[in-house]
Amino acid sequence: QGQPLRGKHILFCLRGLTKVSPYGIISLMPTVRENIAYTFEYFMLVYRGTLLKVARAVAIIALIALALEVFVFNINFFTSSGYRTINLDDRIQLQRNDEGAFLLTDVDHTLEFSSLNTEVRNIRIDFNADQPAQNIAVKIQFTYSAHQTYFDTTEYTVGIPDASVSTVVDPSKFINLQTAGYVENLRIEVVGEDVSYPILLNGVSLNAHRPFAFNPLRFVAVFGLLLLGYAFRPKSAIYRIRIVENPRKSKAGIIFAVAIELALTTTFLFYGSNLVGVATSSYNYGAWNGTSLVNTFEVGGDNAQQYAMLAQAMAKGQLYLEEEPPQWLKDMEDPYDKGARYEAQKETGEPYLFDVAYHDGHYYVYFGVVPVLLFYLPFYLLTGANFPTAIGVLVMALLFILGATALLDRFARYHFRSVSLGVYLLLQIPLVFCCGIMYLVKFPTFYSLPIMCGLAFSVWGLYCWMRSRLAAHKCGWLFAGSLCMALVAGCRPQLLVLSLLAFPLFWRPYITERRLFSPRGAREFACLAAPYLVVAAGIMWYNHARFGSFTDFGANYNLTVNDMTKRGWNIGRLAPALFAYFLQPPSATGVFPYLQPAPFDTTYMGQTIKEVTFGGIFACLPVLWILPFSRRILKLRISQRSTRTIAGVIVVL
C-alpha cells in the first residue's frame, strides 16, 4: 500500500510462505488452516485500529437503541405504574357466551358507564384474542368538569378522534385519554361499516397498567437506522472510497447493501402482506392442507384470479376464459353500462366477473399477457395448481433491485468516475425504496404484477443497452436489451415510453457517425430492432385473435365502473386532469400516515373517472422544475461536444 515494510510485516510474510518439516526441509506449502490463520492475523494487523473504532461506535449505537426501546418506546409502562386500576366488568350490561366473554352485536355495540367520578388516564378495551382478527374503530366520549354533556366535532372544535383497536394486538387495546379533572360519564361505541359481528369482549378497565414490552423487531429497526445514519455521516469513510479507484471495496459495499435490501423486501412481502397465497405448517397455517410441505391457495376473491384463469384457458388452447358469462349479460343491449348490469344482476341473482373484458359472449383478460406466459402457464402445466401471484411480484421486485443497482453501477463506473461509494448508495437506496415497488410488494395482486414486470424489464433493458455502448461484441447486449424493453408492451404498455431513451443512446453512433450503413453496424441495428418486431407481431396476433384488431388490447371492453366504449376524449375533463397529475400540491396531516389523498374538484358537468392521487408530479418532485431550462443545458452540452442527441433527449424529457 505504498508504505515501507517493517520487521513484523516481513516476519508475517515468511511465516505465511515457509514451513519446517520434521526432516529439516523447508516447505512452501502451508495448510489451509494456516493460510486462514495467517490471513486473519494480517487483516487484524492492518485494520485493528479501524475495527476497534467501528466496534466502539456500534456498541454505542446499540446502547442508544436499547435506551430508546426501554425508556422511550415503553414510556407508558413507567407512567402507568402508579395508576389505581378500576375494573368495569360488573357494570357491563351485555350478553355473555359460554366462555364468559361479552358479546357485542350489530344491535347492541355500545357501552355506557355513569357516575364514575374518578380520574381517568387510560382505558383498556380487552377484546378477546381468540376470534377473527380485525381492526375495530371505537368512538369514545366522556363528560368532565369542562363538559357536562358529551362533546363532538363542531365548526370550531375537534372532538375525540376514533381509536383503532385490533382484536389481536395487545398494545392497541390501551387508549390514553386527555381529561381535565374527574370523569363523570363514559361512553364507548363500536363504529364503522366494515365490522364483523359478534365481537368478543373480555372486559373494560380504567387506569390500566401498561406491561413492559421489549419489541425485538423495533429494536433491530432502530439499531439499523442509527447504523445507517452513522455510516452516511459527513465524515464517513465511505465517501473516500471511489467507485473506480477502489473496485473491490466499492463492490463489496454495494453487494452488502443490496443483500440487505433483498432480505428486507422479501421479509416485507411475507410478513407485511396478507395477500401471499402460500401456506406451510408455520406460515398461513390456516390455509395449509396438512400434508404438503408448501401449498398454494386463492387470495383476493374471484376477481383476482384472472391470470390463473387465463393460464387454464391457454392450457386448453383457447384465449377466452372458461367461465361462461350469465345469459342476462349476453342478452343486454349495452353490457358495459354499470347501472344496467347492477339492475340485471339484482333481478336474476346471477353473478358476473368484474374488471374483465367482455366481447362476443366471452370473458377475456385485457391485462398484459407476458406474466401469464412467464409464470402462470408454466406453473399450471407443471403442477396443475394456480401460480401464487405474490411470488411473481417478489421475484420481479428482486430483479428490479438488482437491475437498478447494476444500471447505476454502470453509470458510476463509466460516466461519473469520481463518484464515491457513499454518494452511490445515497442514490441507490432511495431509488429502491422510494420508487413505488414497496407498495407493489405490500399489495401483491395481479394488478401489481404487470407493473412490477414492466419495471424490472425496463431497468434490465436499459442496463443491457448501456453495456452495448462499450462492448466489443454489441449484438448480444443490444438484442437482450431490446427484448427486455419490448416485453414491457406485454406487461404495462405505458412504460414503453422508456424505450424512447434509445434515441439519445444510439442516435450519434448509428445516425450521426453513419455506423448504420456499415455491414457490422447494420447487423447491430438489426439486433436492436428485431426483438421489437417479434414481440409486436406476437402481441398484434394475440389482439387480432381475441378482438379482430391488431391494435385493440381490449381495455375498452372492460366490465368496470363506467362504459369505456363511450368514454372518448373531452376537453372539459382535460384541465382538472392536468392539474391533478402535474400541479396538485400534496395533502399532508400531522399524524400517521401523514400523506393523505389529494382532493379533486371539477366544474365538468358530466361523469369524471378518477383514482386516488397524492399530488402532482411537479409539486412532489421539485427537481423537475429544471425541465424549462433543459434547452439551455443541452445547448451548453452541444457547444462542448457536438452531437445530434439533442432531439432525442428533448423527446425523452
Kindly give the residue locations of the regions a language model identified:
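Hydrophobic, aromatic-rich transmembrane alpha-helices
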Residues: 598-641
